């Protein structure tokens, strides 16, 4: 049933992509971030939905009357420079077979990012993209938040298998990244009930990040919440809400969660933390020995 729904959704969205290429960019963002096919058990599980959407969107953009121009800005220039540098490092990769396989995977994503930059032109397009990204990641925030509440925080929240956010750390990063967009979603809500729904979704997403048991999520989330408070128009109201809600969530987590977070103070005794620190030292050594980089898979 889930497979049929996804295939019908794909067929249903294609005509709209030919009408407006930006619809393809939005659909790709949904599939790439939400990974709905990973919730199926049939042929849809491994079906290349993202590739199909990318090809259809690219073809639609090429045949459309819209301007085919990349709007250059500082951020876009940095992105294109980064993409170029990734290709350079792949040429000098220490593990060429692995490097080119990963390069192929990454460049497909980068191609669609460039297409998205070209097709998202208006303010409404930007808002639509923000909503799609927020809801796509918010789906896993909702699911993970409910799971954390029902399990009492005794189990880790994981992402969809075979995706960029499959393990607890990458999922936590996605949840923390989604929170500002969910806050933006609250401001866009036209009715009281939609606003309350968006607030609940943001709260569950924060709980999902906490339930991931990721120490990086705790540090990143704290920094992000401080930044949101700093940019808030009503700092007093926002500050009081954070002071009241945050401790309740943290105190509700079990002792094993508190113990893992407290291990930050004794990182020398934690294999995971020391492994990352060793990886940082290794990265510095690679950069010193190979100015052009070690390429994908060097770790």
Label the predicted regions.
Residues 1-88, 97-101, 121-131, 186-196, ...:
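Transmembrane signal-anchor hairpin modules in multi-pass inner-membrane enzymes, especially those
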Residues 8-17, 57, 80-91, 108-115, ...:
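Alpha-helical transmembrane segments of multi-pass inner-membrane proteins
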Residues 156, 163, 255-299:
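Membrane-interface loop/short-helix elements at transmembrane-helix boundaries
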Residues 23, 215, 219, 294-296:
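Transmembrane helix boundary and interhelical junction motifs in multipass membrane proteins
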Residues 37-43, 159-171, 272-275:
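Short aromatic-rich membrane-water interface segments that cap or initiate transmembrane helices
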Residues 17, 33, 106, 119, ...:
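Conserved catalytic core of Hanks-type protein kinase domains
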